[in-house]
Amino acid sequence: MSNESIFEPPAWDERYSGEGKIWSGNPNAQLVAEAADLAPGTALDVGCGEGGDVIWLARRGWTVTGADFSAAGLARAARNAEEAGVAERTDWWQVDARSFDAGGRAFDLVTSQYLHPPEGGMVDVVRRLAAAVAPGGHLLVVGHAPPSGPSHDSGHHTNAQRHAMFLATDLLPGLPEDFEPLVVEQRPHPVTRNGKTMEIDDSTLLARRRP
């Protein structure tokens, strides 16, 4: 993918149309940490990819909508949900987060994991996602923080990808006034690539919409 194409649907359609899994299929760590104790309800996962988080939520009793701008990714996610036996608890929505409009729909949990629109666009995405959170519901946004040192994962991403990274505090301007931030922090965790262990910081924002 070129630096520009990584942010557009055709590049991801091509990637998801290939052989083999792109992602592990395991739920993302911060989703597990923050959603495991929430009472199941309705959830929206924006940027759902192959559906790993959707499947995890559905297995825990949630009714989940997986949203992504890649039709090929959504097709994979639907197949994975069918194989996991949770198809009846899931549905799929092709939409670009940069132009996302909830259209009056509201969810008890809205989550987005590692979605990185270019040029600081994540603040506007947070604003759009917040509009889809029901009163009393939660918004969880997780992404890559900019590398903070030589031991962090600075070489795995392109310049364009690094410029799209954010800190949790960067996202606060996107929260409407009726949201209460509960978690605003970077959470380091080790990863191993090519036999080398390094740290990645997860920028984690959890907020609750007041009833």
Describe the predicted segments one by one.
Residues 136-144:
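Conserved beta-strand signature within the Rossmann-like core of class I S-adenosyl-L-methionine
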